[in-house]
UniProtKB/Swiss-Prot annotation:
Its EC number is 1.17.7.4. (2E)-4-hydroxy-3-methylbut-2-enyl diphosphate binds at residues 41, 75, 125, 168, 253-255, 302. The lineage of its organism: Bacteria, Pseudomonadati, Chlorobiota, Chlorobiia, Chlorobiales. Dimethylallyl diphosphate binds at residues 41, 75, 125, 253-255, 302. Keywords: 4Fe-4S, Iron, Iron-sulfur, Isoprene biosynthesis, Metal-binding, Oxidoreductase. Gene3D superfamilies: 3.40.50.11270, 4-hydroxy-3-methylbut-2-enyl diphosphate reductase, catalytic domain. InterPro entries: LytB/IspH. This is 4-hydroxy-3-methylbut-2-enyl diphosphate reductase. CDD domains: lytB_ispH. It catalyses: isopentenyl diphosphate + 2 oxidized [2Fe-2S]-[ferredoxin] + H2O = (2E)-4-hydroxy-3-methylbut-2-enyl diphosphate + 2 reduced [2Fe-2S]-[ferredoxin] + 2 H(+); dimethylallyl diphosphate + 2 oxidized [2Fe-2S]-[ferredoxin] + H2O = (2E)-4-hydroxy-3-methylbut-2-enyl diphosphate + 2 reduced [2Fe-2S]-[ferredoxin] + 2 H(+). [4Fe-4S] cluster binds at residues 13, 97, 225. Pathway: Isoprenoid biosynthesis; dimethylallyl diphosphate biosynthesis; dimethylallyl diphosphate from (2E)-4-hydroxy-3-methylbutenyl diphosphate: step 1/1; Isoprenoid biosynthesis; isopentenyl diphosphate biosynthesis via DXP pathway; isopentenyl diphosphate from 1-deoxy-D-xylulose 5-phosphate: step 6/6.
Length: 324
């Protein structure tokens, strides 16, 4: 039984790497450190950091803190979080992912330009909450690219200037499906808005802000992180190349759900686990009861490499040694 560990398209993305590195440095220096929300959407990694001294808090506790240090994770936060920190004299360690920071700025400027902002994303995801905060909490958040949820469309106004952006970890095909469906929806109410929406760049937004340029009524900006989305094809091929796949991620990980779906579509014998306790012996046998030829082990952008290695070592020790 060959065990293949994916080291090229699994493990922490750059944004999460930065957050974990900063947290480890501060904890190693024995500093008191609170994290506003789970530092990463992986319970195993959160527990490891909490064992080093990190304390995870929710928003209610955060608002009561005074004169201490708080870590802002890679997902980012809305402006009101920083206002609270200033009032309470909190020392903020801001590890917002640079890609997310750029997206927050884009959302803020689009709102200032008078655009209705649509965010392709998950309503309760912390990144989306942060982006919406930069739109004064007035953005239209749409998770279903087919526009199948009427609740998501209640505040959508098809008669005004509109800009479409995305949570950084959403799927690229879904984003463009949503764009197409919005074009159709807007065309139903106004034929002049029925033409394809215009892709915009940072320079277009800057020109509009300074008054030296203008932007069309309906625009979109693909803000999906390519370091994340580029993993899709690689994981698809990785899943195809193995007899079965063990996908390691936290249940809360949005990116994990997307990537696992890709693995499962490529290889039906793909299994989602958080840690080794979730493994089942039957997964590693073919229909005749013999060991499968190969096992692929991979994970999300919020899955630490040490955990993937732990899973690989456990499977190797349990099945290869037992079958020898």
């Amino acid at each position: 039984m060959k065990i293949n560990l994916d080291r090229t398209s699994s493990g922490f993305c750059i944004g999460v790497q930065g957050t974990i590195h900063v947290a480890e440095e501060k904890l190693a220096a024995k500093e008191t450190l609170f994290s506003l929300g789970d530092v990463v959407h992986n319970e195993v990694e959160v527990k490891r950091l909490e064992n080093l001294g990190l304390t995870t808090i929710d928003e209610a506790v955060f608002k009561e803190l005074q004169n201490t240090s708080v870590l802002i994770r890679a997902h980012g936060e809305p402006p009101e979080t920083y206002a609270t920190a200033e009032r309470n004299k909190l020392d903020i360690t801001d590890t917002t992912c640079p890609v997310v920071s750029k997206l927050q700025r884009t959302a803020r400027l689009l709102c200032q330009l008078g655009y209705q902002v649509i965010i392709y994303g998950k309503h309760t995801h912390p990144e989306v909450i942060g982006i919406n905060g930069h739109c004064s909490n007035r953005a239209v958040i749409i998770k279903h690219a087919d526009l199948s949820d009427p609740e998501e469309l209640k505040t959508l106004d098809t008669t005004i200037k509109t800009a479409l952006i995305s949570q950084t970890t959403m799927d690229v095909p879904g984003f463009y499906e949503l764009k197409t469906n919005l074009e159709k929806r807007f065309a139903e109410s106004d034929e002049t808005a029925g033409k394809p929406w215009t892709a915009i760049r940072d320079i277009d937004i800057t020109a509009a802000m300074t008054g030296i340029g203008t932007m069309p009524r309906t625009v979109f900006k693909d803000t999906i992180c390519r370091q994340v989305s580029s993993r899709n094809k690689k994981l698809h091929d990785f899943a195809l190349a193995n007899s079965c796949v063990i996908f390691v991620a936290g249940r809360k990980s949005s990116n994990g759900q997307v990537l696992f779906g890709i693995c499962r579509s490529a290889n039906p014998r793909s299994y989602f686990i958080e840690d080794i306790e979730d493994l089942e012996d039957s997964w590693f046998r073919d229909n005749e009861g013999s060991p499968v030829e190969s096992i692929g082990i991979c994970g999300a952008t919020s899955t630490p490499m040490w955990l993937l290695e732990k899973v690989a070592e456990f499977i190797d020790g349990r099945f290869n040694h037992r079958d020898a």
